[in-house]
């Protein structure tokens, strides 16, 4: 039986990415970049390595040596991985086996190059991993092998290169969106009072993989009154009146789309329906003002005013880039001061929160989806309605 590999990016896409990165390397006088394996946070901590190699998924460990002007070398764990990844992608021909001794394999490659200044990806600069994601012993072994070389943080170089998505990348994210929505449809087909959380979780993962999705991925969930958001699927059965809040990520060849699928077990109160209708309108209105060239704080102020005009209070303001992980731009609160502007090709998750001032539970009602920034506004990738769903009793 011939192997049918997952889709891969074109050589033209490789040249676009590598050109962006090498231009930034040259500006900072870096002779080489190195990145070590780290499959943490659903493999998002390995996003920069995947951007350079398009290798990864299903907990595959990948490292890379990325010279300014010579052949790029990727490192995987076993000879079998070398065989697989030499066939599964067309970007890198020099794929080497580490046998889990990553620094040793990378040192051997670095000895073949001439360099004095090395950029280390992952030392610092990640919003959700501010202390860095580089294994200390691996880096120390590399530094000891080259005592005369200078090693500096270079996380920002790949983060900046990743921020604006190409047409090929957006197509992969659209596929990830389809995968996420298919999993939601599958979940609601079997969801009813008495069905366990872990049964729903299993049905969603089954659907994702069957649709070409990749694991690990994030399913963030809470149910009950009040709910505690968690990542661990429990054997808790759904019960009448449970309010389900979630963040569901589909992943395709490493690229992520996130959606929300709020629900209530049983009839939905009219007041709740009205609140979610207001949340959907807020989402649409925000999409109309998130345009290429606008500053992030200006949109944040728009959000605050829109919420107040609707008779609610501002709440959580997650607006952050998505792609292979936590991509730029990231705006952690609506009134954060930054000079950043939206650019055409930014891909974002927007899920603006709003609080009913008369709601004693202080619940944060919101809808969310993945969008692409254009000159005229943010284009929503999803097709499912932005509503709260009633789950049968």
Regions found by a protein language model. Name each.
Residues 1-393:
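Active-site neighborhoods and metal-handling regions in enzymes and metal-associated proteins
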């Amino acid at each position: 039986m011939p192997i049918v590999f997952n889709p891969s990016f074109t050589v033209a896409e490789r040249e676009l990415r590598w050109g962006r990165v090498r231009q930034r390397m040259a500006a900072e006088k870096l002779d080489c970049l190195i990145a070590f394996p780290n499959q943490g946070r659903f493999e998002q901590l390995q996003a920069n390595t995947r951007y350079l190699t398009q290798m990864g998924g299903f907990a595959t460990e990948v490292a890379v040596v990325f010279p300014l002007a010579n052949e790029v070398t990727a490192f995987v764990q076993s000879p079998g991985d070398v065989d697989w990844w030499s066939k599964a992608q067309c970007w890198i021909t020099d794929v080497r086996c580490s046998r889990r001794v990553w620094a040793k394999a990378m040192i051997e490659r670095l000895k073949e190059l001439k360099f004095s200044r090395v950029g280390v990806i992952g030392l610092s600069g990640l919003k959700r991993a501010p202390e860095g994601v580089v294994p200390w012993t691996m880096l120390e072994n590399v530094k000891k092998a080259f005592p005369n070389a200078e090693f500096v943080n270079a996380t920002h170089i790949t983060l900046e290169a990743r921020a604006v998505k190409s047409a090929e990348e957006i197509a992969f994210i659209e596929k990830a969106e389809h995968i996420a929505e298919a999993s939601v449809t599958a979940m609601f087909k079997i969801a009813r009072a008495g069905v366990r959380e872990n049964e729903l979780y299993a049905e969603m993962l089954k659907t994702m993989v069957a649709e070409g999705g990749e694991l690990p991925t994030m399913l963030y969930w809470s149910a009950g009154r009040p709910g505690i958001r968690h990542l661990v699927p429990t054997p808790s059965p759904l019960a009448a009146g449970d309010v389900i809040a979630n963040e569901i990520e589909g992943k395709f060849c490493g690229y992520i789309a996130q959606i929300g699928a709020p629900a209530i077990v049983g009839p939905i109160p009219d007041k709740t329906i009205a609140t979610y209708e207001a949340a959907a309108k807020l989402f649409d209105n925000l999409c109309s003002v998130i345009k290429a060239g606008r500053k992030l704080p200006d949109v944040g102020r728009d959000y605050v005013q829109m919420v107040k005009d609707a008779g609610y209070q501002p709440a959580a303001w997650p607006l952050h880039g998505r792609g292979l992980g936590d991509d730029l731009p990231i705006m952690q609160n609506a009134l954060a001061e930054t000079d950043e502007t939206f650019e055409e090709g930014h891909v974002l998750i927007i899920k603006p929160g709003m609080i009913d001032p008369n709601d004693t539970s202080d619940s944060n009602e919101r809808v969310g989806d993945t969008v692409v920034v254009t000159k005229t506004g943010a284009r929503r990738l999803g097709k499912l309605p932005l509503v709260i769903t009633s789950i049968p009793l």
